[in-house]
Amino acid sequence: MPEIFLWTRAAIWAAALFALFVFVPNRHPRAARWDDPTLTHDLGAVTDVWARWDSVWFLRIAEHGYDAATGAASAFYPLYPAAVAVLGRAFFGHYVLAGIVISLAASFCAFVLLYELAEERLGADGARRAVLYL
């Protein structure tokens, strides 16, 4: 089961990097408003490809807390940003990397839980397929 997790995550990462290098130079000019270059770090495209869209809000909350002036950040639950804030400080300010590590750990836990639940009803083969389809 861990091999399914590793292969699927590697495939998603490869697809994201491919999209970054192929499509970003040709993207719509207003698409940049969803990116925040102040949140990216020296780890480059390997991690920054994931700092898009709602992750910008989560990273801002992790670094600076909830801003009462905008109020828009209140739409995001606090557990994930709090975990990113703690791990980000342990990673010396690499909040994007902390978010990736937390997201990977959470998805691995979801894989394990789904496997355990599916194994009871579907057997080992069915559980592996369920995890693969996740």
Predicted regions and their residues:
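Residue-level signature of transmembrane alpha-helical entry/exit and packing/kink sites
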Residues: 1, 96-100
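Start-transfer (signal-anchor) and selected internal transmembrane alpha helices
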Residues: 1-38
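Hydrophobic residues within the alpha-helical transmembrane core of Major Facilitator Superfamily
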Residues: 10, 101, 132-133
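Hydrophobic membrane-targeting alpha-helices
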Residues: 13-18, 22, 86, 113, ...
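Hydrophobic transmembrane alpha-helices and immediately adjacent juxtamembrane helices
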Residues: 45-52, 56, 100, 106-107
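Short hydrophobic/aromatic helix or loop-helix immediately within or flanking a transmembrane segment
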Residues: 49-93
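Transmembrane alpha-helices of multi-pass, membrane-embedded glycan-processing enzymes
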Residues: 80, 84-88, 99-113
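Transmembrane-helix signature of polytopic, membrane-embedded enzymes
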Residues: 97, 115-134
